[in-house]
Amino acid sequence: MEAALAIATLVLVLVLCLAGVTAVSMQVRCIDAAREAARLAARGDVRSATDVARSIAPRAALVQVHRDGEFVVATVTAHSNLLPTLDIAARAISVAEPGSTAARPPCLPSRWSRCCCASPVRVHI
């Protein structure tokens, strides 16, 4: 009886450790994706920014790129399958370069918003 309880506890601890390592890995990927998206969008290349963020971010991540004054803000949010109550997100901010077209990102319609250049660009990966 005690051995069964010990084995079940050990398995639970191992699953939680695996979930923690997976969450940290997803966080690093979200940070990298947000950083690259903000950097590219600040140069005025919003489409490349979302494409690069898609390739770096975890699967099924939500990528948002929008202008906030003189800054370009990129946010990447992913959902952990092993920790269902945990959403992992990262945000990167970059100053828009002078003369860039980052002031008005091109419309990229998605399932969350209608195509409107005044709203943030939201891309579901």
Curated annotation (Swiss-Prot):
UniProt xrefs under NCBIfam families: TadE_Rv3655c
Lineage top rank: taxon: Bacteria
Annotated localization: Secreted; Host cytoplasm
Keyword S-adenosyl-L-methionine among UniProt keywords: no
Summary of subunit composition and partner proteins: Interacts with human E3 ubiquitin-protein ligase RNF213.
Endpoints of the signal sequence: 1-33
InterPro entries: Rv3655c/TadE
Keywords for this protein: Host cytoplasm, Secreted, Signal, Virulence
Function of the protein: Effector protein that participates in the suppression of macrophage apoptosis by blocking the extrinsic pathway. Interferes with caspase-8 activation and binds to the host E3 ubiquitin-protein ligase RNF213, whose fusion partners have anti-apoptotic function.
UniProt protein name: Apoptosis inhibitor Rv3655c
Organism, scientific name: Mycobacterium tuberculosis (strain ATCC 25618 / H37Rv)
Induction summary: Component of the Rv3654c-Rv3660c operon that is highly up-regulated during M.tuberculosis infection of macrophages.
Chief location: secreted
GO biological process terms held by the UniProt record: symbiont-mediated suppression of host apoptosis
Any one GO CC term of the record: extracellular region
